[in-house]
Amino acid sequence: MLPLKQSEEALKDKRRLRWACRRGMLELDVLFEPFVDQAYDELSEEQKAVFRRLITCDDPDLFAWFMGHQKCEDEELAEMIRFMLSRVKV
């Protein structure tokens, strides 16, 4: 169990992350928010870094990648997208 201070920091970080996941497109919100709630804590630190990088991408790119309209050329991001799609049921 995390000491109280670390636990509070982790909760604060998760709130910041949830806020950062808010998108301008509902189609993306229904992917990102449940993923953060259901699966983010299970990721390795490396995977968390990839996820944080993913949420800095532009909404049109994210939408095209998640909907399969375009291929994400960054293999780490593409793997995270596949993982997210396998975990979040919409």
UniProtKB/Swiss-Prot annotation:
* GO biological process entries: succinate metabolic process
The parts of the chain that form a coiled coil are none
A single cellular component GO annotation: cytoplasm
Q: Which InterPro entries match?
A: SDH, SDH_sf, SdhE_FAD_assembly_factor
User: Which residues belong to the signal peptide in this entry?
Assistant: none
In the UniProt record, does the keyword Chaperone occur?
A: yes
Major location, coarse class? cytoplasm
**Record's superkingdom?**
Bacteria
Q: Family membership, please give it.
A: Belongs to the SdhE FAD assembly factor family.
**Tell me, what does this protein do in biology?**
An FAD assembly protein, which accelerates covalent attachment of the cofactor into other proteins. Plays an essential role in the assembly of succinate dehydrogenase (SDH, respiratory complex II), an enzyme complex that is a component of both the tricarboxylic acid cycle and the electron transport chain, and which couples the oxidation of succinate to fumarate with the reduction of ubiquinone (coenzyme Q) to ubiquinol. Required for flavinylation (covalent attachment of FAD) of the flavoprotein subunit SdhA of SDH and other flavinylated proteins as well.
What PANTHER family does the database record attribute to this sequence? FAD ASSEMBLY FACTOR SDHE
This chain's protein is named: FAD assembly factor SdhE
Natural source organism: Idiomarina loihiensis (strain ATCC BAA-735 / DSM 15497 / L2-TR)
